[in-house]
Amino acid sequence: YNAPKGKNSFQQSSVSYLLGDSIFLINRSIIMRPQDNQNDFFEVYDYKNDSILRSFYASNFPKELLEHHGRDQAFQKDIAISNDCKKMVIAYRFLNMISIVNIEKEEINNLFTDGNKLNWEQVIEGTPKPYYTKVHCNNAYIWAMAIEGEDPSTFRSRLDIFDWKGNYLCKAHLDKWVSSFSIDERNQTMYAVTADDMLGRYNIKELLDQLP
């Protein structure tokens, strides 16, 4: 692919998403471009016309964290796109933050899920705590798999559910440490892969009944 703008964006990206007919969301990752010392940068790219429709930063990390040599670990994240491709959610593995993004309006809402500020000092000190392993979403809700416990031997997972305004709706404590999951709302079931590679199935009817 040799279109000038698109080629440059794709070469610098870590992942891209198809939002619609020839429209891509491209993430210029901090990890892929460590020399940039920038926050997570996204571009909405029109493949047919080789044009950048809009661009935005999905985070606003302090300079101390951006320049820290161990930031590659700090910025590990999972991204999910809503069914209508208008919204995006980012859950960070070692930061107590979930970013909710309206892709069309370039509106970003950063939620601090453990305390009222970003815990970047833990990363600088070399003692990062894991917060999230995976995130899923639909047009109505965000499902984030959080980690509870002080060390791997005691880790257990907690399923946090938010709406797109960032309201914390409800949670469910699980008996295992879950690394990945999927939600089957029609059958009111969650399928999960545990940290020791076991497949589990959870009945989430009671949880779904709590949602507005």
List each model region and its residues:
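Blade-level signature of beta-propeller repeat domains, shared across WD40, Kelch, NHL, RCC1
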Residues: 181-212
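Short loop/turn segments immediately following beta-strands, especially the blade-tip
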Residues: 1, 44-52, 101-111, 169, ...
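Loop/turn-rich, solvent-exposed surfaces of beta-rich toroidal or solenoidal domains
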Residues: 124-162
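Structural signature of eukaryotic scaffold interfaces centered on beta-propeller domains
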Residues: 14-28, 71-86, 91, 127-138, ...
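Short, solvent-exposed loop/turn segments at conserved positions within beta-propeller repeat blades
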Residues: 34-40, 91-94, 151-155
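Surface-exposed loop and turn segments in beta-propeller and other repeat-based domains
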Residues: 1-15, 51-74, 107-127, 175-176
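Beta-propeller blade signature
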Residues: 40-49, 155-168
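Hydrophobic beta-strand positions that form the internal "hydrophobic ladder"
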Residues: 30-31, 88, 142, 190
